[in-house]
Amino acid sequence: MFALLFGGILADSLIKRGFKVITVRKTVNTIGFFGSSIFLILIPFQDTLVNILVLLCLVNTCSGICQGGFGVNHADLGPKYTGSLVGIAGSIGMIAAIFSPIVAGYVLEFSNSWNLIFYICSGILIIGGFYYLLFASAEKQFD
């Protein structure tokens, strides 16, 4: 929760300082996605439960911070239609939420280890982070 607030405050303060909205969105999103990816990659190399829990907390922190990026980008694209855009994007995003536990079950059955799952999640974050860097826009597209 605090990371969500921090991500929003960070993004707003950078915009108020004169940074372009798209630059701020991409920066905050990059911190969140690539930060989470790094911490997920480090998890399999830990020997203690405490270290793993700290890394998982850092993953969640980065996930909250990136909400100041893609999480509010809908309002940039179509201020009048933000609710509809969030609903459509959320519905599409739920497809992954439906299939990821199934895929994780197969991966666990195949590998008997969570390590591969952490690597897959990290890879998805890296791909998503680069995709956002390349294609994200803050220009109003729906008026």
Question: Can you name each region flagged by the protein language model?
Answer:
Residues 1-15, 32, 37, 97-99:
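Transmembrane alpha-helices of Major Facilitator/SLC transporters
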Residues 10-11, 15, 103-112:
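Interfacial helix-cap and linker-helix signal at transmembrane-aqueous boundaries
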Residues 15-17, 73-83:
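Paired intracellular helix-loop junctions of major facilitator superfamily
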Residues 21-27, 106-124:
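A membrane-interface helix-boundary motif in multi-pass transporters
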Residues 24, 81-88:
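Cytoplasmic loop-to-transmembrane helix junctions
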Residues 43-44, 121-143:
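Multi-pass alpha-helical transporter architecture, strongest
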Residues 57, 61, 87-95:
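Transmembrane alpha-helical cores of Major Facilitator Superfamily
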